Amino acid sequence: MFYSCLKKILFQLDPEHSHEFTFRHLKRITGTPLQFLISQSVPTKSVDCMGLSFKNPLGLAAGLDKNGDCIDVLGAMGFGFIEVGTVTPLPQQGNQKPRLFRVTEAEALINRMGFNNLGVDYLINNIKRSRFGGVLGINIGKNKETPLEVSKEDYLICMDKVYPYAGYIAVNISSPNTEKLRQLQYGDLLEDMLTSVKKKQTQLHEQHDRYVPVAVKISPDLSEEELIKLADAFLKHEIDGVIATNTTLDHSLIQGLNHCQQSGGLSGRPLQPSSNETIRLLSKELKGRIPIIGVGGIDSLMAAREKIAAGASLLQLYSGLIFQGPALIKKIIHHI
């Protein structure tokens, strides 16, 4: 009831202003006793995945708390894990505004944010102050000005810095909003990226005497043949997990709706079919050897169960939280 009233107010604002307003106030209470105002009691439903123990299988997807400003207060909502970022080596403003749009009729969002963030060092300072007891994933990417051919260097810089603080590291090579980034999912660029990331992971494991799993986040807009090649590459390089999926450039399911012509990645309910199919095909190829984190359009208990049936071991929310509120977290965890 409270969130329904709050949503009516927030949805009167521009989506990005609404996000900034919400996070400005959440930041004030994160890590303070006032967190009880939005904290929720959820049952423990432990899941072992990627060598980690998760209190429950539901997490927050990357993109909502890019800079780690509100880790503790978001954790108090009941998430078993939180993924912050996408973060880049240097701060950057992202793409020109407006760049975030609500497709309210479809409970969907379109964004072309472009990895706007305050940089990896700012994120780490926030993580150091956090007392979140769940698993913390850190999603990393490249700066806009870094040429694609040397983009792996940005990922390696971020890995170096976040490794001591991460439960797992998510390598984002699938955002549609950084020019040519998705090319990193193919051919020699993919091979070079995976080789470099695994080599760096081995070095950091030895340096810190602690193994931090690496997951790769992929697009829902891949053909079956492309997915098979990706799966083969992940198996070859012994990647620890796959996050499926990022947002889609296919807007066909929202034709005729408000903002449907806006460019950018579509998330929310219309993403469910392609995300589920990607997970199903990927699961078939990986044969249980690499776990899948399912994300894309989870807005109900049924949608969560469909992701698990398709082959996901863990789940993540983003748009569903915006449209349904924290009650969705509690409902899914209680009944999953």
Swiss-Prot record:
<feature type="binding site">
    <location>
        <position position="217"/>
    </location>
    <ligand>
        <name>FMN</name>
    </ligand>
</feature>
<feature type="binding site">
    <location>
        <begin position="111"/>
        <end position="115"/>
    </location>
    <ligand>
        <name>substrate</name>
    </ligand>
</feature>
<feature type="binding site">
    <location>
        <position position="172"/>
    </location>
    <ligand>
        <name>FMN</name>
    </ligand>
</feature>
<dbReference type="GO" id="GO:0006207">
    <property type="term" value="P:'de novo' pyrimidine nucleobase biosynthetic process"/>
</dbReference>
<keyword id="KW-0285">Flavoprotein</keyword>
<feature type="binding site">
    <location>
        <position position="172"/>
    </location>
    <ligand>
        <name>substrate</name>
    </ligand>
</feature>
<feature type="binding site">
    <location>
        <position position="66"/>
    </location>
    <ligand>
        <name>substrate</name>
    </ligand>
</feature>
<comment type="similarity">
    <text>Belongs to the dihydroorotate dehydrogenase family. Type 2 subfamily.</text>
</comment>
<dbReference type="GO" id="GO:0005737">
    <property type="term" value="C:cytoplasm"/>
</dbReference>
<dbReference type="InterPro" id="IPR005719">
    <property type="entry name" value="Dihydroorotate_DH_2"/>
</dbReference>
<comment type="subunit">
    <text>Monomer.</text>
</comment>
<feature type="binding site">
    <location>
        <begin position="318"/>
        <end position="319"/>
    </location>
    <ligand>
        <name>FMN</name>
    </ligand>
</feature>
<feature type="binding site">
    <location>
        <position position="177"/>
    </location>
    <ligand>
        <name>substrate</name>
    </ligand>
</feature>
<feature type="binding site">
    <location>
        <begin position="246"/>
        <end position="247"/>
    </location>
    <ligand>
        <name>substrate</name>
    </ligand>
</feature>
<keyword id="KW-0665">Pyrimidine biosynthesis</keyword>
<dbReference type="InterPro" id="IPR005720">
    <property type="entry name" value="Dihydroorotate_DH_cat"/>
</dbReference>
<dbReference type="InterPro" id="IPR050074">
    <property type="entry name" value="DHO_dehydrogenase"/>
</dbReference>
<keyword id="KW-0472">Membrane</keyword>
<feature type="binding site">
    <location>
        <position position="86"/>
    </location>
    <ligand>
        <name>FMN</name>
    </ligand>
</feature>
<keyword id="KW-0288">FMN</keyword>
<dbReference type="GO" id="GO:0106430">
    <property type="term" value="F:dihydroorotate dehydrogenase (quinone) activity"/>
</dbReference>
<dbReference type="GO" id="GO:0005886">
    <property type="term" value="C:plasma membrane"/>
</dbReference>
<dbReference type="GO" id="GO:0044205">
    <property type="term" value="P:'de novo' UMP biosynthetic process"/>
</dbReference>
<dbReference type="InterPro" id="IPR012135">
    <property type="entry name" value="Dihydroorotate_DH_1_2"/>
</dbReference>
<feature type="active site" description="Nucleophile">
    <location>
        <position position="175"/>
    </location>
</feature>
<keyword id="KW-1003">Cell membrane</keyword>
<feature type="binding site">
    <location>
        <position position="139"/>
    </location>
    <ligand>
        <name>FMN</name>
    </ligand>
</feature>
<feature type="binding site">
    <location>
        <position position="297"/>
    </location>
    <ligand>
        <name>FMN</name>
    </ligand>
</feature>
<dbReference type="Pfam" id="PF01180">
    <property type="entry name" value="DHO_dh"/>
</dbReference>
<feature type="binding site">
    <location>
        <position position="245"/>
    </location>
    <ligand>
        <name>FMN</name>
    </ligand>
</feature>
<keyword id="KW-0560">Oxidoreductase</keyword>
<dbReference type="InterPro" id="IPR013785">
    <property type="entry name" value="Aldolase_TIM"/>
</dbReference>
<protein>
    <recommendedName>
        <fullName>Dihydroorotate dehydrogenase (quinone)</fullName>
        <ecNumber>1.3.5.2</ecNumber>
    </recommendedName>
</protein>
<comment type="function">
    <text>Catalyzes the conversion of dihydroorotate to orotate with quinone as electron acceptor.</text>
</comment>
<feature type="binding site">
    <location>
        <position position="268"/>
    </location>
    <ligand>
        <name>FMN</name>
    </ligand>
</feature>
<comment type="pathway">
    <text>Pyrimidine metabolism; UMP biosynthesis via de novo pathway; orotate from (S)-dihydroorotate (quinone route): step 1/1.</text>
</comment>
<feature type="binding site">
    <location>
        <begin position="62"/>
        <end position="66"/>
    </location>
    <ligand>
        <name>FMN</name>
    </ligand>
</feature>
<dbReference type="InterPro" id="IPR001295">
    <property type="entry name" value="Dihydroorotate_DH_CS"/>
</dbReference>
